[in-house]
Regions:
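Zinc-coordinating Cys/His ligand positions in small cysteine/histidine-rich zinc-finger domains
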Residues: 248, 252
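Active-site region of PLP-dependent enzymes
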Residues: 4
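Short, intrinsically disordered, charge-balanced linker/junction segments flanking boundaries
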Residues: 268-281
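His/Cys-centered metal/cofactor-coordination and adjacent catalytic loops
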Residues: 1
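Active-site-proximal cap/lid insertion segments
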Residues: 7-72, 76-196, 200-245, 258-266
């Protein structure tokens, strides 16, 4: 269903922004597009091509951004469904993808002056070109103040101040999502479901924050291809950290196994139940 936002707030502009200063700029560009008779189906692209900040510090409640609204919707679903029967709830968050938008309180968890930029920001000796990219995704996030340039190796070169701000934004966005997951977990506890619900937290890729002079994903370095995976089963008393590779295709057979369902024979993935129990390393 449609997401709901707190009283006084509308859907974030361009899907991202709630900061009043940014909203004013976006409105001005939109009015210019209308005055220039831009096709209304292309107005958002017209705006994004001219103004799309890579981060935003919002003096807003959690629910004003889409991820807070998604968390609230998930909590509403848990209140409405019949949880006496088995249920499956998939919750997909946008952050910490770009742009790094989050309420101010999550930015204030970190001191930007103490943030360290990546120590190694150049192309490795004898590295293959295909492993690198120009960080086109990052370059698509623009404001009049931000100037992107490429170094002699064709890699994105950002000044230290902007790098620290982006890393700060990544941290803030990650903490924002952590808090939304916490809210859903609290609802499970409130409904007495925390002791019989399997929870999986995973990301779809890693992220470069200036290392190798790379930003975003889109590389074949482990920094981009490795993603987090946390599986919680309340029946398992001890946690294990697994260092051997797993794959996304392992999730379905793992959940089937943990739910005592038959695992289809035609799957490429493998159940990780043994690893979760500490039986397999």
């Amino acid at each position: 269903g449609n997401l709901e936002y707190p009283s006084g707030y509308y859907q974030p502009a361009l899907g991202f922004y709630q900061n009043k200063k940014n909203l004013t700029v976006i409105k001005g560009i939109k009015n210019k597009a209308i005055a220039n008779n831009i096709d209304k189906r292309k107005i958002n692209k017209y705006i994004r091509d001219r103004f799309k900040p890579p981060y935003e510090i919002g003096d807003v409640p959690d629910g004003a951004y889409i991820d807070g609204a998604i968390a609230n919707k998930s909590i509403q679903i848990l209140d409405e469904i019949n949880t006496s029967k088995p249920f499956f709830l998939a919750v997909g968050f946008k952050r910490p993808h770009l742009p790094f938008v989050a309420p101010r309180k999550y930015w204030e968890l970190y001191d930007e002056n103490k943030i360290k930029i990546a120590p190694y920001q150049k192309k490795s000796k004898n590295a293959v070109d295909i492993a690198y990219h120009k960080a086109g995704e990052m370059q698509s996030y623009k404001t009049p103040e931000i100037i992107y340039k490429l170094n002699k190796d064709g890699l994105l070169e950002l000044d230290e101040k902007l790098q620290k701000k982006l890393i700060h934004g990544y941290y803030a966005a990650t903490s924002y999502i952590d808090a939304q997951i916490g809210k859903i977990n609290e609802k499970l506890k409130e409904k007495g479901l925390d002791k019989n619900t399997i929870i999986v937290i995973w990301g779809d890729h890693g992220w470069h924050l200036g290392d190798h002079s790379l930003w975003n994903k889109h590389s074949n370095f482990e920094q981009a291809t490795r993603s987090p995976l946390i599986i919680y089963d309340p029946r398992i008393n001890k946690g294990y950290k697994i260092n051997t590779p797993t794959e996304f295709v392992d999730l379905f057979p793992t959940l089937s196994d943990l739910a005592n369902l038959n695992i289809p024979k035609n799957l490429d993935g493998l159940s990780l139940k043994g690893q979760l129990n500490g039986e397999v390393t």
